[in-house]
Design a protein with these regions (language model features):
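Short His/Asp/Glu-rich catalytic/ion-coordination signatures at enzyme active sites or charged loops
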Residues: 5-34, 184-198
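Well-ordered alpha/beta subsegment
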Residues: 6, 141-145, 149, 218-222
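Contiguous, amphipathic alpha-helical segments that mediate oligomerization or scaffolding
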Residues: 8, 18-53, 204-223
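Extended, charge-rich alpha-helical segments
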Residues: 43, 47-94, 110
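Aromatic- and glycine-enriched beta-alpha-beta binding-site module
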Residues: 74-133
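Compact, glycine/acidic-enriched structural inserts
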Residues: 108-167
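Charge-rich, low-complexity terminal tails
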Residues: 171-224
């Protein structure tokens, strides 16, 4: 197993959360750079593992997946200047693509392995819903498989209150069409990253997610 210093990442993020101001950050820039380098190392390892079963992401580098630590506070009541997590969005089409991708989020008491498509344009969202409706048996075989539900018991995070326009209200699986985004989240505790088989567990989670992503991306491929 490749050695990765995850505790260094968590310790910096804990300290940053308690001291989220520019003066403290500037005084601890070296610690930030060390923690960021450790996260990039971790992310590179995860990318390499995923690429063994998803060849589309081979060659992707951490810099292609990560985000600036500076928050955009222009339209937020929270004016703290820095994010208190590190995140990496692994997507063969790029971070801004509508395609489903894999997401790794490290945050003390808030880490997750996730993925999906957020903020889809209305025409693509409608097409995805239509694809689910037309191929519901295939979709249900994925998302209601016990192995999938072990990690992702819920599809989506924000939902319509009623059936989307153009679909029958009495459709048995209408809840799957009410999703405003097609995403999955698997929350993990901090000690998950200290387990000796951590990378093998990440493999299992993202192998299951890939089945969902492949279904959604089949439709999105027509638009990108």
């Amino acid at each position: 197993m490749i050695k990765m210093n995850i505790p260094v990442i968590f310790q910096f993020l804990k300290d940053l959360s308690a001291n989220n101001n520019r003066e403290w950050f500037n005084e601890h820039k070296a610690e930030y750079e060390t923690a960021r380098a450790e996260f990039d190392n971790f992310l590179a390892t995860v990318i390499a593992r995923i690429s063994l079963f998803d060849e589309t992401i081979r060659g992707i580098q951490p810099k292609d997946c990560t985000y600036r630590i500076y928050r955009d506070t222009r339209f937020s009541a929270d004016k703290t200047p820095y994010k208190i997590h590190f995140g990496g969005y692994i997507n063969a089409k790029g971070k801004k693509s509508d395609h489903c991708g894999y997401y790794v989020h490290l945050q003390p008491d808030g880490s997750m392995l996730a993925g999906g498509s957020l903020c889809l344009p209305s025409n693509i969202l409608k097409a995805v819903r239509q694809s689910i409706y037309d191929n519901i048996e295939e979709f249900v075989a994925i998302v209601e498989d016990p192995e999938f539900k072990k990690y992702f018991p819920v599809i989506g995070e924000d939902f319509l209150k009623t059936a989307p326009k153009g679909f029958p209200k009495d459709f048995k699986y209408i809840d799957y069409l009410k999703c405003k985004e097609y995403v999955c989240f698997y929350n993990v505790p901090d000690d998950f990253f200290a387990q000796p088989d951590m990378l093998e567990q990440i493999d299992k989670v993202f192998r299951q997610f890939k089945r969902f992503a492949d279904f959604i991306n089949y439709t999105i491929d027509d638009f990108e």
